[in-house]
Amino acid sequence: MANATINEYFKKGFPNDPILQDVSMIVRTDVESVREVVHACLKPEKSPLIQSDLAQKLGIDSLWFKDERNRMNLGSFKAIGASYVLAREAAARVGFEATEEELKNSLHDKSYVTASAGNHGLSLANGARLFGAKAVIYLSKTVPTEFGDYIKTFGAEVVVAGENYEESMQAAAKAASDNDWILLSDSTWEGYSAGIDVMAGYLIMASEAFEECPITPTHIFLQAGIGGYPASVAAYARKYYGDAPKIVIV
């Protein structure tokens, strides 16, 4: 059986696939342009990078984790994702020097829809609230009712559809087509690439963590989800650190 922990492409570049030769086609790493939008329109406080006492129990030198629980008061590690995309559109309309009053109604004529297992939908709902847009979040039947109720507190409409995430996404895509809404998924597929910009929002937490961490980590652990979050952070980690850390997707 092959050893799944061994990366056959380590220090060899990307596989010989034309799609992967230009990384910008699948992921963004332009953190400065993302930071400009986020700081102008969202103004989130930096989340803490915490050194854990668990390292001693595990017998390792140090263990750090990025605590996103209080970012924008969402309790979500994807607080800046979909909200970044809406912030960028708001900035394009009213400018980077716009007042809070100008920003809060800047997308009043826009309607966004997505499917989510939780965190991404929360970011879209919050972004829509901040910029006066409409947000419709499709959740599958497996998502707890309490989470749907929480999303509603941000002014979003919640629709339960489908037995799983894939079916709820199909329902969201159909709703977008039927109602002329903007589909804003945090994933991509053939013919749909808006998810790349959602993923770019995650660069904020990655850049904060890497810049604050006093050492070059040996390992970076990332939550998997549907792949957008780890793809974004992993790509930026390779840009920032090179091949040094081993990246583990959990």
Spans of features found by a protein language model:
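PLP-dependent amino-acid enzyme catalytic core
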Residues: M1-V250
